[in-house]
Amino acid sequence: MEDRKLEAAESLALIGRMIENTRSRMVRNSGRPLLAWGYATVLTTFAVWGAVLYFQNPRWNYLWLMLPLLGWLLMWVSREKKPEGEVRTFVDRVIGNVWTVMGLSAWFVSMLALFTPMRLPILFIILLIMGMGTTVTGLIIRFTPTAVGGVAAIILAPFTLIAGNMWQPLLFIAGFVVMMIVPGHILNYKSNHPAR
């Protein structure tokens, strides 16, 4: 293809095709990451919550450290072989960068909460950060359930601040179910049952 300046209409059409290509690939591939991280978070939350309640010892909060391990393990187990010649588009890179920033931010705040004397409302902060990342992803790929799930998590996040200790983990779990697990299953369903 020769280098030339694109006219405005050609440029918009190219951007539209890139978004649509990414969106169609996202519909096929996006369900697994949402499900892996959603289920990893829910399972870890239940484990931490149950251990802290049963043993009455806050040191069980260190179980949160298994979340990234479980999430990456589920991602690895559920991976699929990439087709030869698949190209990463600009939109793919944008979404990857969004999640790199959100993930590193969540990790940094979590480390502060676990290893410093700071008292941080960690469930609120993490639900808010992940809700923002999910909303941005849903808006970029133009997939309403993902965007709405992210907004629902953002709205739910402040309720973790006013809920008692017993209810905070349940609200956190509900946020991840609405934000990642439900949209992840919808994406998988749509990819397995394409519109005709």
In which residue ranges do the predicted regions lie?
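Structural signature of hydrophobic alpha-helical transmembrane segments
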Residues: R59-L70, A113-L128, I173
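Membrane-proximal helix-loop-helix units in multi-pass membrane proteins
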Residues: F90-G150
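Selected alpha-helical membrane-embedding segments in polytopic membrane proteins
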Residues: R25-L112
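N-terminal juxtamembrane cytosolic/stromal segments of multi-pass membrane proteins
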Residues: M1-S30
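C-terminal ends of transmembrane helices
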Residues: N21, L73-F90, M132-L139, P183-S191
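Terminal transmembrane helical module of multi-pass membrane proteins
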Residues: V136-R196
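Hydrophobic alpha-helical transmembrane segments
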Residues: A47-Y54, V109-T116, T134-I141, A157-N165
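Helical transmembrane-bundle signal
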Residues: T41-V48, P68-W72, A106, L127-T137, ...
